[in-house]
């Protein structure tokens, strides 16, 4: 007998949301890398993407191990860039009247 459990669904970005996030990132930082190879890892964010359109995006953290790896070292200097990016996405999507 073989027991088989489906774990996480595929994490599939919505093209429109991915493009929007990349455009805002470029406006905030002046550059964006959209030429990364797809990853085969599981991510619980995929459940959210099954319910609503969106995009799972990497901010960039320099030359370190991936998140959840014991050797991962978060680069605190990325915080202002990430904060500015998220704030600009919110302000662009929901501008003040």
Per-segment meaning from a language model:
Residues 1-97:
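Metal-dependent amide/peptide-bond hydrolase catalytic core
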